[in-house]
């Protein structure tokens, strides 16, 4: 998706075609990308005034998707620096014309990067589509597109997974893409060339062109390809259903497994957080993070290590967005915690020029959740077993564990007394934003940050 290696002239010419930047009412060709880089080429009239809703309809017709897919997918404008989901009323052409202004406002791009960057249109999952409804989809092509997007995010590291979960997902991907397991056809040698499309590359370390090995749950050495092959063998098949129905079942199984990840279906934003002071010189710094926001909550992910730093559902947090004069935009997350056994409130500062976007999305998701059905996890069978499994994973230092020791937070207690740090000045309490089970915290008289 990064076209930085192309010249500005050729990149712009390509952009005029693929991203709807044109003027006039004559017919124009538009290229829209799917998450797997498949393209949809459309010829549309009045490109400069066409809405995302109208373009969405043309894409559904081209893909032969049912009308129900209108809620499942959305049009996005994507570049390496910014991702924007378009509302149905948005006009993609006009948003594209404003792209450089958006980059200047919501990113830290250099002037040269802003001038060179061009977005493209992508058809992908709507972040406001509930997971519960996703598992009720019966249309195979719709399920396929959702599967492709989930798999892409797993392989790309946007959805960090434990090795065991990646093995299971890799086995399901083998079944979906290679057909039912056949011991004569499917061997480690046939799986090896496909590993990059089955297993996240960041979990694989190549040596002399071959994948190294890791210890599985039994402690013995097993190659990546053999481990994926073993999970492929274990994929359950039903002789009572057709291959078409079996494919649908396996798509749902893959998606259902991804639903266990708190950041499934999220919009992702760039930010940095303070590191705790370390070492003899008590040095600190900042850590690049991805902030993932969906209908259920907010997750802060270490972009380098590919694991959660903290994940909170909306009832567990309060938030605010501040932009002090001549200072950075900050998204504040407030949540319960403890300091050496003392219950405290914790404040996490996320520095990001996209803090305004994040705050607005959090507010909208909370409002939406108050008017719609409960999150999908409440409807999944065996939910108590899932909760038990999640607890077990966290005890084993899963990528899903909260890692508070890697975060530098401001801690304080309800009477305003500081625990090493004190509450910063604010004009309003976090708790005016939403009703939670937290008690309002009284500010200290002379708050300062250390």
Curated annotation (Swiss-Prot):
Keyword Metal-binding among UniProt keywords: no
InterPro entries reported for this sequence: Band_41_domain (IPR019749), FERM/acyl-CoA-bd_prot_sf (IPR014352), FERM_2 (IPR035963), FERM_central (IPR019748), FERM_domain (IPR000299), KRIT1/FRMD8 (IPR051594), PH-like_dom_sf (IPR011993)
Keyword line: Cell membrane, Cytoplasm, Membrane
Annotated GO biological process: positive regulation of tumor necrosis factor production
Pfam families membership: FERM_M, KRIT1_FRMD8_FERM_C
Domain FERM: 28-373
Any one cellular-component term (Gene Ontology): plasma membrane
UniProt cross-references to CDD domains, sorted A to Z: FERM_B-lobe
Record keyword Aminoacyl-tRNA synthetase present: no
SMART domains: B41
Subcellular location: Cytoplasm, Cytosol; Cell membrane
Task of the protein: Promotes the cell surface stability of RHBDF1 and RHBDF2 and prevents their degradation via the endolysosomal pathway. By acting on RHBDF proteins, involved in ADAM17-mediated ligand shedding. May negatively regulate Wnt signaling.
Name of the featured protein: FERM domain-containing protein 8
Organism: Xenopus tropicalis
Phylogenetic lineage: Eukaryota, Metazoa, Chordata, Craniata, Vertebrata
